[in-house]
């Protein structure tokens, strides 16, 4: 299973990369907005420059999302994003226009990530259009009392049934249990906030054991 980090923070990406477990990065307009919330002069050129900096840190897929809704505009913007770096994956929302853009990109060698996926039919359409990745948002489904992980299971089953090569990225991960469940149902990737990545390494019994080991080690003479 691959681990992506879901952030636009360069510091968080660097910290996660130092752990030796990072395979890629996903960003979106909301994550970008968090890091520039105090900036009044942030331009689209600044956005592209920031994405380029991310690509310099991680040797793996970096998802950068289009910020338009019409297919033609998505295509123009996506081609511009793809030109930033060979590892760029263009994120397109799973809409009718998004599907048109995904099909265009897949036909022209540009990798895509179908995002904002909330149903198995959306995921099936993404695979048929040639998306390289599909991102079901489990946390947001859980928020409305619907099983996000059941959606992931359905997508994995459908893709396995028909041999689709589209990789499933479990998105909107809120806690370590989401990561465990993603691995259990066979998702290819979980994209995880840095705060949750750190939680994956923690356990109270590990802390308790270390405390005891250090106490015992203290009695040894230099």
UniProtKB/Swiss-Prot annotation:
<keyword id="KW-0963">Cytoplasm</keyword>
<comment type="pathway">
    <text>Carbohydrate degradation; pentose phosphate pathway; D-glyceraldehyde 3-phosphate and beta-D-fructose 6-phosphate from D-ribose 5-phosphate and D-xylulose 5-phosphate (non-oxidative stage): step 2/3.</text>
</comment>
<dbReference type="GO" id="GO:0005737">
    <property type="term" value="C:cytoplasm"/>
</dbReference>
<dbReference type="InterPro" id="IPR001585">
    <property type="entry name" value="TAL/FSA"/>
</dbReference>
<dbReference type="GO" id="GO:0004801">
    <property type="term" value="F:transaldolase activity"/>
</dbReference>
<dbReference type="GO" id="GO:0016832">
    <property type="term" value="F:aldehyde-lyase activity"/>
</dbReference>
<protein>
    <recommendedName>
        <fullName>Probable transaldolase</fullName>
        <ecNumber>2.2.1.2</ecNumber>
    </recommendedName>
</protein>
<dbReference type="GO" id="GO:0006098">
    <property type="term" value="P:pentose-phosphate shunt"/>
</dbReference>
<comment type="similarity">
    <text>Belongs to the transaldolase family. Type 3B subfamily.</text>
</comment>
<keyword id="KW-0570">Pentose shunt</keyword>
<dbReference type="InterPro" id="IPR033919">
    <property type="entry name" value="TSA/FSA_arc/bac"/>
</dbReference>
<dbReference type="InterPro" id="IPR022999">
    <property type="entry name" value="Transaldolase_3B"/>
</dbReference>
<dbReference type="InterPro" id="IPR018225">
    <property type="entry name" value="Transaldolase_AS"/>
</dbReference>
<keyword id="KW-0704">Schiff base</keyword>
<dbReference type="InterPro" id="IPR013785">
    <property type="entry name" value="Aldolase_TIM"/>
</dbReference>
<dbReference type="GO" id="GO:0005975">
    <property type="term" value="P:carbohydrate metabolic process"/>
</dbReference>
<dbReference type="Pfam" id="PF00923">
    <property type="entry name" value="TAL_FSA"/>
</dbReference>
<dbReference type="InterPro" id="IPR004731">
    <property type="entry name" value="Transaldolase_3B/F6P_aldolase"/>
</dbReference>
<feature type="active site" description="Schiff-base intermediate with substrate">
    <location>
        <position position="91"/>
    </location>
</feature>
<keyword id="KW-0808">Transferase</keyword>
<comment type="function">
    <text>Transaldolase is important for the balance of metabolites in the pentose-phosphate pathway.</text>
</comment>
